[in-house]
């Protein structure tokens, strides 16, 4: 059985088991405000409401070692299938590189498929989730990893006051680089401040530690503004402070959520 088939089988088995544990009618949380993975590096620790379909989109510009890259649409589709379970689909991103003699080319990246299972709230008031995923090698020849690359993320969050939240994520991935995999650990932490009811700002540190190659240390900050209860605009920027890190990155995004189905 291929890794992709194993992954799909795991999703189906987990979904069937979780269905029996459904605690509320699907659609009961449809009116809750939107909560996105954007624009932080760390993913959100909560799932989208059951029956809701959420699209998160963006455009970024990154400069690294003299090479500037634009990428879009950064689309992530998240479908709530149970009260604490969502399916996740990462649409291939198009990378546009400035012309250089370094051999960089333009094209689409790989597609990703995964799910999020919310475990919290747990002891201590933490919200915690686990996000297994795998990328599928459908991208351009010079951009795709040409492998089925698994990853697991564990995002967490905890409200400190009515307006301050601490959050972060631990993850491990195994991307294909050339003939081998390069197992990479990652950790991030950020602090979010609710400025007004629809407006949040944050600052975040993220570190990636590959098995081969130097560590990537980054600091980013940004804000998100809910133009409607289930629509959001975001803006972010950051910089690296290690040899392997990007010099800087900036980006904008737009996300929306709507109710796709209901059942009891």
Language-model segments: what does each one mean?
Residues 14-25:
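Bacterial Sec-dependent signal peptides at the C-terminal "C-region" and cleavage site
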Residues 1-3:
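N-terminal secretory signal peptides that target proteins for export/translocation
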Residues 23-264:
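Transmembrane beta-barrel domains of Gram-negative outer membranes and organellar outer membranes
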Residues 5-16:
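Bacterial N-terminal signal peptides
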């Amino acid at each position: 059985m291929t890794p992709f088939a194993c992954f799909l089988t795991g999703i189906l088995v987990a979904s069937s088991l979780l269905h029996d544990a459904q605690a509320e009618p699907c659609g009961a949380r449809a009116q809750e405000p939107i909560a996105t993975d954007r624009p932080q590096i760390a993913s959100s620790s909560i799932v989208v409401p059951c029956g809701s379909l959420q699209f998160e989109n963006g455009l970024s510009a990154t400069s690294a070692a003299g090479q500037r890259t634009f990428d879009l649409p950064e689309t992530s589709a998240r479908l709530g299938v149970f009260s604490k379970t969502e399916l996740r689909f990462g649409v291939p991103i198009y990378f546009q590189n400035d012309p250089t003699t370094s051999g960089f080319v333009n094209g689409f990246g790989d597609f990703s498929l995964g799910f999020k299972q919310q475990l919290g709230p747990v002891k201590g008031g933490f919200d915690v989730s686990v996000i297994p995923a795998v990328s599928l090698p459908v991208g351009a020849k010079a951009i795709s990893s040409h492998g089925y690359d698994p990853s697991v993320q564990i995002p967490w969050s905890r409200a400190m006051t009515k307006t301050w939240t601490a959050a972060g994520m631990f993850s491990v991935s195994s991307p294909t680089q050339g003939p081998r995999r390069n197992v990479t650990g990652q950790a991030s932490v950020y602090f979010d401040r609710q400025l007004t009811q629809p407006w949040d700002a944050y600052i975040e540190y993220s570190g990636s530690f590959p098995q081969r190659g130097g560590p990537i240390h980054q600091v980013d900050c940004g804000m998100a503004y809910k133009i409607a209860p289930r629509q959001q605009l975001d803006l972010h920027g950051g910089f690296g402070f290690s040899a392997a890190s990007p010099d800087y990155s900036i980006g904008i995004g737009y996300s929306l959520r709507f109710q796709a189905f209901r059942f009891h």
